[in-house]
Amino acid sequence: ALGFQSMAYAGLETGVTDRTSYVVVQDKIRLVFTTPMPGENNEIFDHIKKHGDGVKVIALWVDDAKKAWEETTSRGAESYFEPRTEEDKDGKMVKSGIKIYGDTVHIFIERKNYNGTFMPGFEKWESHYNPESIGLKYIDHMVANVGWNEMNIWEKFYNETMGFANLITFDDKDISTQYTALMSKVMTNGNGRIKFPINEPAEGKKKSQIEEYLDFYDGPGVQHIAVATDDIVRTVSLMKERGVEFLYVPGTYYDTVGDRVGEIAEDMAILKKHGILVDRDDEGYLLQIFTKPLTDRPTLFFEIIQRKGAQSFGKGNFKALFESIEAEQERRGTL
């Protein structure tokens, strides 16, 4: 449905006995899907039992995995595993890891001396089913949901431990309805390529969507993965043809979007037809749409985003997403 191609496989046939992993690729995006095998690797099994399907690892490509680990742990990060070298006939790769919110981890990947398909332990996976790409280019950002009063803790972590800066802040006056609210801070690295928004619940009359996530995921974790496209209308059209369902956007959203956003290149009627949101920052505008949760638990979902100059995020779309998820909460009886 999302147009990814088969890339690599690790499992019994490749000498890996405790898990099976499939790697799929689309342009610069690599996703690894892993399931445990019977045996000694209880970490994967325990993660799935506790959280359901979700994001365990956010991998970061670095020039020096040993230095990245030494620097972050010296600044207070808790180690997930120390630097180690893995190699096969295609070269060597250095990896290290640190723990972040909940049971999520960052793994630092140094692959300058590796020329294989993916990494040691994996072999090329050739599938008979390779659907047409839908135009996804790269991961634009990944959003964390953390617990009460934890947003500033993780802002400080990314700032002081990882060297990130705060790009923009949304408070409970920006993102709220008559029932619920949230607060969010967006952290970004030096070149702006990596963006990690961090959400926490805010006081409201009813249970917010962040609280719902924390209940069903059983703790903090990745709320959604935003993937970029150069043609959001084409991408969304193909996804809908393949059965992907998106969050409903009330038609009234489009009554005022022109006044708020100004002139754009896209046909507003087509955007309304597909439920694509539009917002603007000081540098341009962006278009966004959000899938429904990927599993029965109302946790992880995807965002499709197209940036037309905008480097940050607009408050209008964030609020519209918040309201759409709140409507789904009401349907589920968890508001």
Task: Set out the residue ranges of the language-model regions.
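C-terminal, well-structured subdomains that either form a transmembrane helix-short loop-helix hairpin
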Residues: 221-232
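Vicinal oxygen chelate
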Residues: 25-36, 57-146, 150-151, 156-157, ...
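Long hydrophobic segments that form regular secondary structure
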Residues: 142, 158-164, 219-221
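Short, well-structured beta-strand/strand-turn elements
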Residues: 5-10, 165-170, 246
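A generic N-terminal leader/anchor concept
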Residues: 1-57, 64
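Amphipathic alpha-helical scaffolding segments
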Residues: 2-4, 75-79, 160-164
